[in-house]
Amino acid sequence: MSKKEETIFFRIEKENRPESSKKEEDENSTEEMTTLNHASVTLDHSAFAIADKDGFKMYQLNPLHFRMYKDYVIKVGPVRLVKQDGNSRRIIYVSALAGGRFAQNNLMIFDVARNEEYFEITTPSRYGPITNIHVSPNRLVALNPNRMFVWTYPDDIKQIRSEDIRSNPKGISAMSYDPTTAACYLAYPGFKTGSVQIMHLNALTARESKSPIVIEAHLTDIAQVALNCQGTLVATGSTKGTVIRVFDARTKGPLYELRRGTVQAHLQCMAFSPCSSYLAVASDKGTLHMFGIRDAEPQKKKNVLERSRGSSSIVKIQLDRPVMAIGFGKIPETPKNLQSIIAICADATYWRHEFYKDNTGNFTSHFGSYDELIEVANDSSFFRTPVE
C-alpha cells in the first residue's frame, strides 16, 4: 500500500533569472550535431517532444511545426526523459545524469503557457532513478527500476498509489487513454518471465487496487510493449525480437502473431496507429515494419504451419539509424486513404513516409519528407504554432 510520505511535492515559484538574447541561444544550440536522449509522441499522435543536452523541444507531429509559446525558454539543463501533455500546455521531464539541474528521482513539470517550472515531485531515493514517465489527461505515472508511482493529474496533483513491479531498469511500459470513456491503462512487464501486466489506472485508490490483467506472451523477457488508445489491444515483443504478438487486453486471448524477421533483433520502439488498424515496429536491423492489424488473419483461424510463420509486414521502411519514437498522422486536404507514418530518430531527424491501400487491397508506400529537428527549431523564418 502506498504512503503519503513516499513522494515529496513542491510548487515552484517563478525564479529571477538573467535575460538572454535569442541570438546567443541560437548560436549555442547549433554548435554541434545533436544526439537525442529521448523522444516521445503524445497519446493522440498530435505532437511530440525531444530531449537532449540543451533541454527539451516540442513539435506538432504532422505536418511538422515547432511548438514553443515564446522565443525564450527557460534553461532547464540537459534532459534525459520527456513527455508532453496532450494539450501542449505542460512538459514532464527528468534531468540528465551528466550536468542535469535536478536529481534522477525528481520529476519536473514545466508549464509552457507560463514559461516556467511550477511543480516538482520527488520519488524516494531508495527506489533509484526514474526510468520512464507517462502522462494522460487524468493520470501521471513514473517508473523506477522496481517501483511504480501513480498520481492524479493535471489539477491538484496527488499520489494515488505506488506498487512493486518486476525489475525494469529500462522502464519498458506503455500507456493508453480513451478520450470517449477517459479510461487509462498502463502495460508493463509482469513478474513472470515473458508476461505483461495491464493495470486500469482509473480503478486505483490509496487503499486498494484491482489485480492487473496478466498475459503470458513470450518465453523470454519482454523488450517492448504497446497499447492501442482504447486499451483493448496490447502488442508485445521479446528480447528475441523476431515475433510480435497481439492480444485482446480484456480476455487475454491471442489475436495475431506478426513476423518481424527470422534473425534476432533488438526492438527499439513499437506503436499502434490511433485507429488501431496498424502497428509499427522498429529494430536495430535498420528497418521499420508496419503491420495491418485488420488485414492480418486471426490466430484461431490459422493451421499449425501458418501459425509458426506468422503474418508479414505490409510496409517495410529502411532507416539506417536508431528510432526513438513512432507516430501516425494524416495531412489535411489529402486523399482519405493516404496516411503517414513518422519516425523520430536518435540523430534528431524526422522521417515521414506516406502509405495507402489501393483498390486491389495492396499497400504502397513512398518517402514523404525529411527534416533536421534542431534546424527546424532554430530557423527564425519557420512558422511557429502558438501553444494556447
Swiss-Prot record:
<protein>
    <recommendedName>
        <fullName>Ectopic P granules protein 6</fullName>
    </recommendedName>
</protein>
<dbReference type="GO" id="GO:0005737">
    <property type="term" value="C:cytoplasm"/>
</dbReference>
<dbReference type="GO" id="GO:0044804">
    <property type="term" value="P:nucleophagy"/>
</dbReference>
<dbReference type="GO" id="GO:0000425">
    <property type="term" value="P:pexophagy"/>
</dbReference>
<feature type="short sequence motif" description="LRRG motif">
    <location>
        <begin position="258"/>
        <end position="261"/>
    </location>
</feature>
<dbReference type="GO" id="GO:0034045">
    <property type="term" value="C:phagophore assembly site membrane"/>
</dbReference>
<feature type="region of interest" description="Disordered">
    <location>
        <begin position="1"/>
        <end position="33"/>
    </location>
</feature>
<dbReference type="GO" id="GO:0016236">
    <property type="term" value="P:macroautophagy"/>
</dbReference>
<dbReference type="GO" id="GO:0080025">
    <property type="term" value="F:phosphatidylinositol-3,5-bisphosphate binding"/>
</dbReference>
<feature type="region of interest" description="Required for atg-2 binding">
    <location>
        <begin position="265"/>
        <end position="328"/>
    </location>
</feature>
<dbReference type="InterPro" id="IPR048720">
    <property type="entry name" value="PROPPIN"/>
</dbReference>
<feature type="repeat" description="WD 2">
    <location>
        <begin position="262"/>
        <end position="301"/>
    </location>
</feature>
<dbReference type="GO" id="GO:0061723">
    <property type="term" value="P:glycophagy"/>
</dbReference>
<dbReference type="GO" id="GO:0005829">
    <property type="term" value="C:cytosol"/>
</dbReference>
<comment type="function">
    <text>Component of the epg-6/atg-2 complex, which is involved in the generation of autophagosomes from omegasomes and in the distribution of atg-9 and atg-13 during the autophagy-mediated degradation of protein aggregates. Binds to phosphatidylinositols on preautophagosomes, which are early autophagic structures, to promote autophagosome formation.</text>
</comment>
<keyword id="KW-0072">Autophagy</keyword>
<feature type="repeat" description="WD 1">
    <location>
        <begin position="217"/>
        <end position="257"/>
    </location>
</feature>
<dbReference type="InterPro" id="IPR015943">
    <property type="entry name" value="WD40/YVTN_repeat-like_dom_sf"/>
</dbReference>
<dbReference type="GO" id="GO:0030674">
    <property type="term" value="F:protein-macromolecule adaptor activity"/>
</dbReference>
<dbReference type="InterPro" id="IPR036322">
    <property type="entry name" value="WD40_repeat_dom_sf"/>
</dbReference>
<keyword id="KW-0963">Cytoplasm</keyword>
<dbReference type="GO" id="GO:0000422">
    <property type="term" value="P:autophagy of mitochondrion"/>
</dbReference>
<dbReference type="GO" id="GO:0032266">
    <property type="term" value="F:phosphatidylinositol-3-phosphate binding"/>
</dbReference>
<dbReference type="Pfam" id="PF21032">
    <property type="entry name" value="PROPPIN"/>
</dbReference>
<comment type="similarity">
    <text>Belongs to the WD repeat PROPPIN family.</text>
</comment>
<dbReference type="GO" id="GO:0034497">
    <property type="term" value="P:protein localization to phagophore assembly site"/>
</dbReference>
<keyword id="KW-0446">Lipid-binding</keyword>
<feature type="compositionally biased region" description="Basic and acidic residues">
    <location>
        <begin position="1"/>
        <end position="25"/>
    </location>
</feature>
<dbReference type="GO" id="GO:0070273">
    <property type="term" value="F:phosphatidylinositol-4-phosphate binding"/>
</dbReference>
<dbReference type="GO" id="GO:0010314">
    <property type="term" value="F:phosphatidylinositol-5-phosphate binding"/>
</dbReference>
<dbReference type="InterPro" id="IPR001680">
    <property type="entry name" value="WD40_rpt"/>
</dbReference>
<dbReference type="GO" id="GO:0000045">
    <property type="term" value="P:autophagosome assembly"/>
</dbReference>
<keyword id="KW-0853">WD repeat</keyword>
<keyword id="KW-0472">Membrane</keyword>
<comment type="subunit">
    <text>Interacts with atg-2; the interaction is direct.</text>
</comment>
<keyword id="KW-0677">Repeat</keyword>
